[in-house]
């Protein structure tokens, strides 16, 4: 399954001229806008994405004129706490669990809040290093979305990708995103996005590639301990792991020697803590 997914990613990359993760990061670091596409079995849409700290009125105007979607600001959980942003709804009923906070506006320096200049100003205020809750008012014309800890390795959304990519670029982990619609108001799909990118000289990246890149270069799971464990089938080595993003624990029972050069059979079972002993 993993191999077939990677083969599909390579085919898409070759067929549509998809940029590498490194190229997308370089574009964001340079203050340019990119297109980011998620999976066909998810929202199957492309968003315009740029690093929030480089936002300009011209960039906002481009997004609303050519992207036509909702201008959102991806923020980390930490930044949302810093700004004391309440969630938009107590119960999130959206299909993909997008974590909208209440919409925001800069407290000073804006007029009605809807102009490109006003929206850029609001974003600049929200991502300033020393930003405080009093710097913003609610509601407003910018829609923050809160990324889950762990980023795309936990949730494969544009929200998490925006924060991940800007952080990987060495920038403030926040991005301005806007969905791309076709002139008739329907969602632009990959072939449409390729044409759009060529028309506006924008590079296209995929969230699938970002997930693969992060999976190959880092891990959110760390080993916290191990000990021998006697079972009805002999002695196993019990290895405990902790998920750094969620704090949840995982237990691996290993029998024999494990080598990266030899394919190792793996069996995955989900047990509650009180069920573990009775099943060993």
Predicted regions span which residues?
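Glycine-rich, N-terminal phosphate-binding loop and its surrounding beta-alpha-beta segment
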Residues: 56-115
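N-terminal, positively charged regions that mediate nucleic acid binding
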Residues: 13-45, 49-56
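Extended, low-hydrophobicity, polar/charged segments
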Residues: 41-42, 51, 61, 80-82, ...
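Structured core elements
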Residues: 35-37, 49, 72, 101-103, ...
């Amino acid at each position: 399954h993993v191999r077939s997914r990677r083969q599909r990613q390579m085919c898409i990359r070759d067929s549509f001229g998809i940029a590498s993760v490194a190229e997308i990061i370089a574009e964001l670091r340079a203050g340019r806008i990119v297109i980011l596409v998620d999976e066909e079995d998810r929202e199957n849409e492309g968003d315009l994405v740029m690093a929030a700290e480089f936002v300009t009125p011209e960039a906002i105007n481009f997004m609303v004129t050519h992207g036509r979607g909702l201008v959102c600001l991806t923020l980390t959980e930490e930044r949302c706490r810093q700004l004391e942003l309440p969630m938009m709804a107590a119960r999130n009923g959206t299909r993909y669990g997008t974590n909208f906070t209440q919409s925001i506006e800069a407290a000073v320096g804006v007029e009605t809040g809807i102009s490109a200049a006003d929206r850029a100003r609001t974003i600049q205020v929200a991502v300033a290093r020393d930003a405080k809750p009093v710097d913003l008012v609610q509601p407003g014309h910018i829609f923050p979305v809160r990324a889950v800890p762990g980023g795309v390795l936990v949730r494969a959304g544009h929200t998490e990708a925006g924060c991940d990519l800007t952080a990987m670029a060495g920038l403030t982990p926040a991005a301005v995103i806007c969905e791309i619609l076709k002139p008739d108001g329907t969602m632009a799909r990959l072939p449409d996005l390729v044409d759009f990118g060529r028309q506006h000289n924008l590079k296209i990246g995929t969230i699938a590639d970002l997930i693969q890149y992060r999976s190959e270069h880092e891990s959110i799971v760390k080993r916290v301990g191990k000990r021998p464990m006697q079972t009805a089938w002999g002695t196993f080595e019990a290895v405990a792991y902790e998920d750094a993003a969620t704090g949840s624990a995982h237990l691996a029972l290993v029998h024999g020697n494990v080598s990266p050069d030899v394919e190792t059979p793996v069996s995955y079972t989900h047990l509650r803590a009180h069920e573990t002993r009775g099943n060993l």
